């Protein structure tokens, strides 16, 4: 390459001064610049070549002849490396030629302005989609691609606002079906989903809360389901039923509350005890506290472990033992019935005397069973 440049140096004598003199004398018409208003003609005007383009114009042809199997991109890479390898002295003639072409271009096209071609932008795959449209499309089909913004806005204008029912379909139906399938469970609302505005967090606890019966016999019939209830089964339809309680110590579960004492449960049968589970509870109705007092959480074991906290003197201090002896000696009420009531925790009503004075009432049976249990508990 250096030998070629040395043999054919670029000199100013190659600029054809005779031709320039003819053009300056006006013997031949000069090049008429194209009108600026013609956009089609202006779009065809090429930029003046720089020094690299002047050098690569002939060098590319030479490399293409030597390497016919190479792609044009590969040839461009080779030309770039070769141009960087040249020294400043070797690049000088090409730089001068590029400057001459630039000045000539300015004379030919004085109103020329470089306007780069706009690259054809492909359609963007990921467009910004309305968030509400994405939420509403979840209920239709999760496999379909999101539509354009215009369609999403059109649907939003047609529907007005995005209702939570359309965004989260079937939440209430899922809750109802779950509650119907598992009546012993209250927390059937699906986790991980936001609560709809029209649905309060406490509304999930109100339905199906009348699953406890007013009679204690249904509670005794299903003892293995009740301890697993997670929520507070208080019922708004709280009605006292004083003569259905057959459990001798059923009312003692409320003995820990400050409003209801232990002895009051023995002296009189309270209303039917509302069962509350062994998990933490949240009272929903404040009017129940007026009847039951402020309830404390129940003990861990459903047995009689709470009796360990009370001494025998506190339990029997206010009782008349002669009254219990009178009831124990009553005919028709054998000791076997008391023993069975002590072991099972139930005293059948049929074993008590059906007729007689007030000592045959349910209060007497409860007091009799309580005293018998305390005596056997102290002996053991």
Swiss-Prot record:
This protein is called Transcription factor SOX-7
Q: What range(s) does the Sox C-terminal domain occupy?
A: 260-380
User: Does the keyword section mention Methyltransferase?
Assistant: no
Ranges of the DNA-binding region feature: 45-113
Give the CC-aspect GO terms: cytoplasm; nucleus
Family matches, as InterPro entries: HMG_box_dom, HMG_box_dom_sf, Sox7/17/18_central, Sox_C, SRY-related_HMG-box_TF-like
Report the gene name. Answer: Sox7
Q: What induces it?
A: Up-regulated by VEGFA.
Q: Print the keywords alphabetically.
A: Activator, Cytoplasm, DNA-binding, Nucleus, Transcription, Transcription regulation
**Which terms does the UniProt entry file under GO BP?**
endoderm formation; negative regulation of DNA-templated transcription; positive regulation of DNA-templated transcription; regulation of transcription by RNA polymerase II
Region of interest (Disordered), ranges: 24-43, 139-167
Query: What quaternary structure, including any partners, is listed in this protein's UniProt entry?
Result: Interacts with CTNNB1/beta-catenin; this interaction may lead to the proteasomal degradation of active CTNNB1 and thus inhibition of Wnt/beta-catenin-stimulated transcription.
Q: What is the lineage of its organism?
A: Eukaryota, Metazoa, Chordata, Craniata, Vertebrata
Pfam families the UniProt entry points to: HMG_box, Sox17_18_mid
Span list, region Required for beta-catenin-binding: 323-328
| Cellular compartments annotated | Nucleus; Cytoplasm
């Amino acid at each position: 390459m250096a030998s070629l440049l040395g043999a054919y140096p670029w000199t100013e004598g190659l600029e054809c001064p005779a031709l320039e003199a003819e053009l300056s004398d006006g013997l031949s018409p000069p090049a008429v610049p194209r009108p600026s208003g013609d956009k089609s003609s202006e779009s065809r005007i090429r930029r003046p070549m720089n020094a690299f383009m002047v050098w690569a114009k002939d060098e590319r042809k030479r490399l293409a002849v030597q390497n016919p199997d190479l792609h044009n991109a590969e040839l461009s890479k080779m030309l770039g490396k070769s141009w960087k390898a040249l020294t400043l002295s070797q690049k000088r003639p090409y730089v001068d030629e590029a400057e001459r072409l630039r000045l000539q271009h300015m004379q030919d096209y004085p109103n020329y302005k470089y306007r780069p071609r706009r690259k054809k932008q492909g359609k963007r795959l990921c467009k910004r989609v309305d968030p509400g449209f994405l939420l509403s499309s979840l209920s239709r089909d999760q496999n379909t691609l999101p539509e354009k913004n215009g369609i999403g806005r059109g649907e939003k204008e047609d529907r007005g606002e995005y209702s939570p029912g359309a965004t989260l379909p079937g939440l209430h139906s899922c809750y109802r079906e779950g509650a119907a399938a598992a009546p012993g469970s209250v927390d059937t609302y699906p986790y991980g989903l936001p609560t709809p505005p029209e649905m309060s967090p406490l509304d999930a606890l109100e339905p199906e809360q009348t699953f406890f019966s007013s009679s204690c016999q249904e509670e005794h019939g299903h003892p293995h389901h009740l301890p697993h209830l997670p929520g507070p089964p208080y019922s708004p339809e709280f009605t006292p039923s004083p003569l259905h309680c057959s459990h001798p110590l059923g009312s003692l579960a409320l003995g820990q509350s400050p409003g209801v004492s232990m002895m009051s449960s023995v002296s009189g049968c309270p209303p039917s005890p509302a069962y509350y589970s062994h998990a933490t509870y949240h009272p929903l109705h404040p009017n129940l506290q007026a009847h039951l007092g402020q309830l404390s959480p129940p003990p861990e074991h459903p047995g009689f472990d709470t009796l360990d906290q009370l001494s025998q003197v506190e339990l029997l201090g206010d009782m008349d033992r002669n009254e219990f002896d009178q009831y124990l000696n009553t005919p028709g009420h054998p000791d076997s019935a008391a023993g069975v009531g002590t072991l099972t925790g139930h005293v059948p009503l049929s074993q008590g005397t059906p007729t007689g004075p007030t000592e045959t009432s349910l209060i007497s049976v409860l007091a009799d069973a309580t005293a018998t249990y305390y005596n056997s508990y102290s002996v053991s």
